[in-house]
């Protein structure tokens, strides 16, 4: 019987070493050499401290900052571990919403967000990504339209000209990859850092 089991055990050990140890270490090493920033998590450092990642969104509530997409991520309720509470941009629990298009709770939330945004900028159409969560709940980017929609509020809150803030948005807008893939986008954290740097000058 041992004769029959031995080849299977040898294959198990060999594949475990190759797939579970050698391959991950090799890929991590290669990534660290070829793409050091991305391999380390695309971390953004300010004044020697890590303040975020270019790959994970953050919640900004202050009027003087651009806001990202809504996030449907949650966390365990400290008062009752069998329940969850809203925890926007919780990278430990990446998820979208389970609410479907016929959900009253979802429709009420979207309507409330639209009304709030309309009050902020009555003359413009509300971009869809400002009222809909992404599938991961961690999207760090918004469309240029969503950023431009927020320009009047941010300019007002900071005492800046709308034209100057608009130019900053345009400067932070990334185009399609190779001119073909994806959509133009703006990283919210990078935009807010650029805004802070401009305001300090």
From Swiss-Prot:
Keywords: ATP-binding, Cell inner membrane, Cell membrane, Ion transport, Membrane, Nucleotide-binding, Potassium, Potassium transport, Transmembrane, Transmembrane helix, Transport
Domain of life: Bacteria
Subcellular localization, as worded in the UniProt entry: Cell inner membrane
GO cellular component: plasma membrane
Biased composition range(s): Low complexity: 70-82
Residue spans crossing the bilayer: 10-30
The family this protein is said to belong to: Belongs to the KdpC family.
Function: Part of the high-affinity ATP-driven potassium transport (or Kdp) system, which catalyzes the hydrolysis of ATP coupled with the electrogenic transport of potassium into the cytoplasm. This subunit acts as a catalytic chaperone that increases the ATP-binding affinity of the ATP-hydrolyzing subunit KdpB by the formation of a transient KdpB/KdpC/ATP ternary complex.
Protein name from the UniProt record: Potassium-transporting ATPase KdpC subunit
Species in which this protein is naturally found: Rhodopseudomonas palustris (strain BisB5)
Source organism phylogeny: Bacteria, Pseudomonadati, Pseudomonadota, Alphaproteobacteria, Hyphomicrobiales
């Amino acid at each position: 019987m041992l004769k029959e089991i031995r080849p299977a055990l040898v294959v198990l050990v060999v594949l475990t070493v190759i797939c579970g140890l050698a391959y991950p270490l090799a890929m991590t090493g290669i990534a660290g050499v070829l793409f050091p920033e991305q391999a380390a998590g695309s971390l953004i450092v300010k004044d020697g401290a890590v303040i975020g990642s270019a790959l994970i969104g953050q919640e900004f509530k202050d009027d003087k900052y651009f806001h990202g997409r809504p996030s449907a991520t949650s966390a365990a309720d400290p008062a009752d571990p069998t329940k969850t509470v809203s925890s926007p941009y919780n990278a430990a629990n990446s998820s979208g919403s389970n609410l479907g298009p016929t959900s009253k709770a979802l429709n009420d939330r979207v309507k409330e967000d639209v009304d709030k945004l309309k009050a902020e900028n009555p003359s413009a159409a509300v971009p869809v990504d400002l009222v809909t969560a992404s599938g991961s709940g961690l999207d760090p980017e918004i469309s240029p339209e969503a950023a431009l929609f927020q320009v009047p509020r941010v300019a007002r809150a900071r005492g800046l000209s709308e034209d100057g803030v608009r130019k900053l948005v345009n400067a932070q807008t990334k185009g399609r990859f190779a001119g073909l893939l994806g959509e133009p986008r703006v990283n919210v954290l990078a935009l807010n850092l650029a805004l802070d740097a401009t305001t300090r000058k």
